[in-house]
Amino acid sequence: MEQIIAKRYASALFDVAKKEDRVKEYYEELKKAVEILQTEAVWKIFVNKSIDKTKKMKFVEEVLEGFSKEIVNFVKVAISKHRENLIKEILNEFEALYKAYFNMIDVKVISAYPLKEEVLNLVREKLEKKYNKKVNLIPVVDKEILGGLKLVIGNTVIDGSIKARLEALLKNMRQAV
C-alpha cells in the first residue's frame, strides 16, 4: 500500500516537473532534500507524530531554505497528509520515473578486483549498444567470484564469473558420475 501511495506522490511531482521542463532539476533537488531530511537529528523531528503539522511545516521551511518553493511545498503536502515517513520511497519512485524518462538503466558490475576506467567504459559502451539505453554502472568488488564479471541488470543476472563456471563444471561432473 505504501508503495502505491509513494508512486502517486512521485507521479504527481513528476508531472509538474515535465510540464515545467525541469525534470532533472526537480530530481536533483528532491534527492538533496531527502538527504537533508534523513539526517538523524532532522529525521527524528520530521517523522515525529507528536509534533504538530504546522510546526513541522515551519521546520521544513527552515531546514530546506534555499530550495525551490515547489520542492518545499511538495514536502509540506506530504506532511499535511501524514506521509512524511514515505519521503524516501517517493524519491525512489521519482527516480524510477526519471530514469525511464531519460532512457537510463543501472547495471551492477561485480568483479573480484576494482576495474580500470577503460574496462568500465568498454562495458558501458557494449551495454548501451545492446540495450539502446544510457547505462549507469555501479562497480562492486566481490572477491568470492574469483575472476571474470557478473552483471546485474534489473532482475537479470549475466554471470561470467570464474566461480559460476567452476560450479557449472562441478555440476556436470556430478551428473556424469
From Swiss-Prot:
<dbReference type="GO" id="GO:0005886">
    <property type="term" value="C:plasma membrane"/>
</dbReference>
<comment type="similarity">
    <text>Belongs to the ATPase delta chain family.</text>
</comment>
<dbReference type="Pfam" id="PF00213">
    <property type="entry name" value="OSCP"/>
</dbReference>
<comment type="function">
    <text>F(1)F(0) ATP synthase produces ATP from ADP in the presence of a proton or sodium gradient. F-type ATPases consist of two structural domains, F(1) containing the extramembraneous catalytic core and F(0) containing the membrane proton channel, linked together by a central stalk and a peripheral stalk. During catalysis, ATP synthesis in the catalytic domain of F(1) is coupled via a rotary mechanism of the central stalk subunits to proton translocation.</text>
</comment>
<keyword id="KW-0406">Ion transport</keyword>
<keyword id="KW-0066">ATP synthesis</keyword>
<dbReference type="InterPro" id="IPR026015">
    <property type="entry name" value="ATP_synth_OSCP/delta_N_sf"/>
</dbReference>
<keyword id="KW-0472">Membrane</keyword>
<comment type="subunit">
    <text>F-type ATPases have 2 components, F(1) - the catalytic core - and F(0) - the membrane proton channel. F(1) has five subunits: alpha(3), beta(3), gamma(1), delta(1), epsilon(1). F(0) has three main subunits: a(1), b(2) and c(10-14). The alpha and beta chains form an alternating ring which encloses part of the gamma chain. F(1) is attached to F(0) by a central stalk formed by the gamma and epsilon chains, while a peripheral stalk is formed by the delta and b chains.</text>
</comment>
<keyword id="KW-0375">Hydrogen ion transport</keyword>
<dbReference type="GO" id="GO:0045259">
    <property type="term" value="C:proton-transporting ATP synthase complex"/>
</dbReference>
<comment type="function">
    <text>This protein is part of the stalk that links CF(0) to CF(1). It either transmits conformational changes from CF(0) to CF(1) or is implicated in proton conduction.</text>
</comment>
<protein>
    <recommendedName>
        <fullName>ATP synthase subunit delta</fullName>
    </recommendedName>
</protein>
<keyword id="KW-0813">Transport</keyword>
<dbReference type="InterPro" id="IPR000711">
    <property type="entry name" value="ATPase_OSCP/dsu"/>
</dbReference>
<dbReference type="GO" id="GO:0046933">
    <property type="term" value="F:proton-transporting ATP synthase activity, rotational mechanism"/>
</dbReference>
<keyword id="KW-1003">Cell membrane</keyword>
<keyword id="KW-0139">CF(1)</keyword>
